[in-house]
Amino acid sequence: MRTLGVDLGRVRIGLAVADEILRTARAVTTVVRRTEAEDLSAIAEVARDYEVTRAVVGLPLNMDGTEGPSARLARGFAPRLEAALGVPVELFDERLSSFEAESRLRARGLSAREQRGQVDAEAAAVILQGWLDRRAP
């Protein structure tokens, strides 16, 4: 079974995949947002390519656990993604995922400019790895 991780941003959408047997997530690509229909189509193409059986969308909660506008955006997007993909979609707390993604990319020696094109997909991998780790026995 493969799972798709989604870091939903206002400008870009990061995507990652995980093989649940290996229990590791990896960044795949970043989709530059256009219309929602185009966004869903681009995500669905990646989902088909990787034969995913479920998706996990990051839920950007505030540090105190409350939901702001970005969390409401993710909550609204998740059911539409589920319909577009035809697989179950779950939400997962993504607090500090972008910070962790930037830290990982810096550790690999990437400059801030080089990180720009990769941070969203890496954040999706962070979200998905957190989801996998939470499910571990």
From Swiss-Prot:
SUPFAM superfamilies, per the entry: Ribonuclease H-like
Subcellular location: Cytoplasm
Alphabetical list of Gene3D superfamilies matching this protein: YqgF/RNase H-like domain
Broad class of where this protein is predominantly found: cytoplasm
Coiled-coil stretches: none
Pfam families: RuvX (PF03652)
Xref: InterPro entries: RNaseH-like_sf (IPR012337), YqgF (IPR005227), YqgF/RNaseH-like_dom (IPR006641), YqgF/RNaseH-like_dom_sf (IPR037027)
Its EC number(s): 3.1.-.-
Gene Ontology cellular component annotations, sorted alphabetically: cytosol
Biological process (GO), any one: rRNA 5'-end processing
UniProt GO MF annotations: nuclease activity
Domain of life assignment: Bacteria
Cysteine pairs bridged by disulfides in the record: none
Key words of the record: Cytoplasm, Hydrolase, Nuclease, Ribosome biogenesis
Task performed by this protein: Could be a nuclease involved in processing of the 5'-end of pre-16S rRNA.
Family assignment from sequence similarity: Belongs to the YqgF nuclease family.
Protein name in the entry: Putative pre-16S rRNA nuclease
Lineage of producing organism: Bacteria, Pseudomonadati, Myxococcota, Myxococcia, Myxococcales
